[in-house]
């Protein structure tokens, strides 16, 4: 059975994800990209992974500079998510008007994020039309306990709290049978 790109994308769109902006600095130029393909990899050493399209300038900049930062967006930072995804019409410099901080690696850090992780490229793996870039976390900082920005089914969203204290285990009396 062959999986079409459309079916593959539709299935993956069902997975809710946090939203990050990955940034780097190379040859005096800031680069940034909205990324939802972000994961923790290891605690010792502290490693994370991002997946970036091989055709993008930011991919080349990360590989050439050997550094990147991951900025975890709060729900109030939808504009950053859209801006760095290239969804703001007429915007050529995604950093225009954004007062960034500078990480120890030189990567730009967005203000007031949930957290940021400053990374050195540990390893780059081929992954089809993307690279799986593993970074060693050199520095990190958490923000002020805000709620995360979420991306699900090609829509931006936020978390709605569920009262887990009233949840019944699957298969027990009172458990939901809805799909």
What are these regions (language model features)?
Residues 1-179:
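Basic, polyanion-binding surface patches
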């Amino acid at each position: 059975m062959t999986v079409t790109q459309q079916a593959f994308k539709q299935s993956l769109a069902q997975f809710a994800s946090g939203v990050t902006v990955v940034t780097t600095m190379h040859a005096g130029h800031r680069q940034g990209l909205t990324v939802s393909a972000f994961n923790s990899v290891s605690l010792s050493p502290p490693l994370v992974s991002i997946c970036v399209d091989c055709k993008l300038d930011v991919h080349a900049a990360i590989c050439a500079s050997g550094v990147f930062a991951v900025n975890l967006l709060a729900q109030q930072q939808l504009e950053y998510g859209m801006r760095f995804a290239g969804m703001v019409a007429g915007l050529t410099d995604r950093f225009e008007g954004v007062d960034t901080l500078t990480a120890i690696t030189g990567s730009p850090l967005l203000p007031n994020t949930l957290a940021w992780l400053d990374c050195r490229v540990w390893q780059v793996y081929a992954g089809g039309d993307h690279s799986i870039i593993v970074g060693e976390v050199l520095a990190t900082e958490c923000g002020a306990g805000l709620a995360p920005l979420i991306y699900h089914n090609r829509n931006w969203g936020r978390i709605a709290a569920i009262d887990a204290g009233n949840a019944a285990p699957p298969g027990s009396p009172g458990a939901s049978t809805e799909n």
